Structure formats: C-alpha cells, structure tokens
Amino acid sequence: MANITNEFMGHDMLAPFTAGWQSDMEPLVIEKSKGSYVYDINGKKYLDTLSGLWCATLGGSETRLVEAANKQLNTLPFYHSFWNRTTKPSLDLAKELLNMFTANKMAKVFFTNSGSEANDTQVKLVWYYNNALGRPQKKKIIARAKAYHGSTYISAGLSGLPPMHQKFDLPPPFVLHTECPHYWAYHLPGETEEEFSTRLANNLESLILNEGPETVAAFIAEPVLGAAGVILPPATYFDKVQAILRKHDILFIADEVVCGFGRLGTMFGSDKYNIKPDLVSVAKALSSGYMPIAAVLVSQKISSVILSESNKIGAFCHGFTYSGHPVACAVALEALKIYKERNITEVVNKISQKFQEGLKAFADSPIIGEIRGTGLALSTEFVDNKSPNDPFPYEWAVGTYFGAQCAKYGMLVSSTGDHVNMAPPFTLSLEELDELIRIYGKALKDTEKRVEELKSQKK
C-alpha cells in the first residue's frame, strides 16, 4: 500500500486533548484492529498497549461483541428509557451489574454514555439526596489532586489536573481538592507508607472541619489513579479515609471507570482495596470499548431517598436520550458474559506478573524515577537523578520522545508529560508480551541516549 500523506493535515476535527499546532501535522489515523494490534491507514501495525483509552480489554476483534451488536440492531436498534418505558437489554444489564458488584450492596443502576457523564450524574444524585433530606447546604465534593474523572463541566472540575481547568473557569466553587496519595513523590524523609496515609487522612479531616462537615457531601476517588500515572494507594489509606467519611456522614463515590472489570486483577478496584462505596461509576471495559456506555450504581441508602422524593415532586428528572441504549447494553451484556466465562481476573493475574516484573526490570535506568503498577496497568515516570524533585526540563519532552520511539518500533503508549502509561488488552499473549517488553527496552535505550545528548548541549 502506498503511503497516504498530507490528506488529513488541517483536518476538520476540534480534537480532544490536542494542541492547535498539531492540526498542521499529519495525524496518526487508525483504520482497523485485530486482537492486541491496531493498523494505520498505511498498513503499519502497532501493539496497542493502552487498550485504546484503557477500554478495549477484549482486544480489537472480538466477534461475539460484533454479533451481539448486529443482532440487537436487527431487532431493536433504538428505544429510550424515559417515562417507565425501556428495553430488555437495559433491564438485564442493570440486574447483571448489581449482581457483579459485591464490595457493597447496590440497589439501582442509571445508564450514561461515558465515565464523564457518570461522574457528572453522581454529583447531581448527591445533591438531590441531600436536598431531599433537608440539607441543602451539604453540597461540596472533595476530589484529589491529579485525579481524572472526566471532561464535562462537573467531572472536569472534579479532576485534579490543572490543564483541564485553564480557560474553562474550573474548578467550580463547590469542588475541593485534597492531596494526591503518591507515596514515592510526596512522602517525608523517613515516613513509612502507613504514616504517610495517616498524614493525608488527617489533612483530609482538617479540610472537612475547616469547610464544615455540614457542607461536605461526598468524596470521590479512583481505587488506583489511572491517567495520573497508575498511582496505587499507600498502605491503610482507604481504611483511614473511609473511617473519616463515616464519622462526618460524607458519601464515598468510587470511580471504577478505569479499574472496573478486571484491570487490577480483581473484578473491581473496590474489591482489591476494601472500599465500600455508596455510589459507583463504571464505563470503558463495560463494553470493552465497542459501544459508548457507562453506568452509575446507587446504594439502597441513596436510591430509596431519591425515589421517595421523586414521588413528592412528580418525577426524577434526569436522563439522556441514549441512557441504556439497547445496542450498547446488548454489547455490554455480552462483554460481561465473556468476562465470567473466561474467568477474566484469573487471565489478568496469569499474565500480569510477567508484565509487571518484565517492565520493572528496567527501573535501574538513570532516567527512570519509578515504575509502578498492579494487574495490567503500569506507569513509568521519567526524572533526573532518580528523584521526584528533579524533573527534566519541560522542553526536553522526555516522555513524549519515549512514546515516539515506541511508535517507531510498532507500539502505542500514552505519554503525558514525563510519565508513560500502559494498560494492555486482556487478550495479550505471552509472545505479544515479549514483544512489548522488547520494544520498551529499545525505546528506553534511545531515550537514555537522547537525554545524554541534551545534557551535553546544556553544559
């Protein structure tokens, strides 16, 4: 196939998370997928180590999901879920999700189209709940620095990433941020993980007390911070946080958008870290990314109040045209069926040890500060002198260079600043894992050489 060049330069999309100057460059246009690989319009093959955007867990050619979509399209391509009208796939999926999530008993499911919409909905539910209880002042939401919760007005405000706030008048005044629980980056000299967790928990409680517990409605957290760089909770962190939330009658929203459905080696991140949330957001792997769908799981404590209040005022007036879209629900049902049939957590645990150990073997590199991860999620953080306090100059774009070298050798990663995320599909074979580790090593060697050159130029 002849190379297709320049055709899409200056294209018509206002592309997400992309700078304006990039539209003057040829975009990477992906044309097809097969298993753990994607192919661009020139036929070049890439090992997709981020599962698209943390979502294509079953790879790019799971025929059962395609067949589920086709069957539903030929039966009922669309119907809504307003006014007590709905479809069987949405009812079946709601039941299946309630059965699957066992960390804390959930009672109702509300469908959205993305994790962003799910987290946006969570805040509306929390407000509705407190208004119904006669606590209109209890509205503030606490999120964490570096967290990613989505891109809608509310979910972007919850996200603790300053670039997502710039020029958007975010975060809104009802959103508060507490510290990121990244032990390697932020612990004090001599401080153990548990002592670090205690300090962060105490600071969280101080924030609550300073604001007034009667004004704080909920705390939202990813079990493992994904986009921030696969930041694992330090020892006893969630135990301490949950005790404080219970003490002050503050709801816990678990954002399982990245962690849910096996990514960490447990069905949900809440299972791994003994989190007992009041509300849960799921998306991404819910359909293995084959259809846009997300869901909000609501505990009995909250759903009973919402339903009772809706009877008083006439209706629960929140929803989307595509809430519970029958095709998306049919695909999600089939994905969940596959996870159960294939014992997907066992699959992840079988391959994740080699994935984690194979990449962490590069941790001695002079340009790597930390390689961290669990299950099939891992992040590499590039720093100078192996210190979190010694980042490379921004203009060196070390992480971006590493990502470009990976692409050159036929592998796609996510490069954000100087950390690089990987979350491969669960279909990854041992041979493909060997290829992943090999390309990582080649790209790292190139990047080390590049950093040496930049340092010599700086002298």
UniProtKB/Swiss-Prot annotation:
Modified residues (N6-(pyridoxal phosphate)lysine): 284
SS bond list: none
Keyword DNA damage: no
EC number: 2.6.1.119
Alphabetically ordered keywords of this record: Aminotransferase, Coiled coil, Pyridoxal phosphate, Transferase
Reaction(s) catalysed by this chain's protein: vanillin + L-alanine = vanillylamine + pyruvate
Coiled-coil stretches: 428-459
InterPro entries: Aminotrans_3, Aminotrans_3_PPA_site, PyrdxlP-dep_Trfase, PyrdxlP-dep_Trfase_major, PyrdxlP-dep_Trfase_small
GO molecular function: adenosylmethionine-8-amino-7-oxononanoate transaminase activity; pyridoxal phosphate binding; transaminase activity
Coiled coil is among the record's keywords: yes
The organism's place on the tree of life at top rank: Eukaryota
Gene3D superfamilies recorded: Aspartate Aminotransferase, domain 1 (3.90.1150.10), Type I PLP-dependent aspartate aminotransferase-like (Major domain) (3.40.640.10)
UniProt note on tissues of expression: Expressed in placental tissue of immature fruit.
Function: Involved in the biosynthesis of capsaicinoids natural products, pungent alkaloids synthesized from phenylpropanoid intermediates in the placental tissue of chili pepper fruit acting as repellant on herbivorous mammals and conferring spiciness to hot peppers. Can transfer an amine from alanine to vanillin, forming vanillylamine and pyruvate.
Protein name per its UniProtKB record: Vanillin aminotransferase
Gene source species: Capsicum frutescens
GN (gene name): PAMT
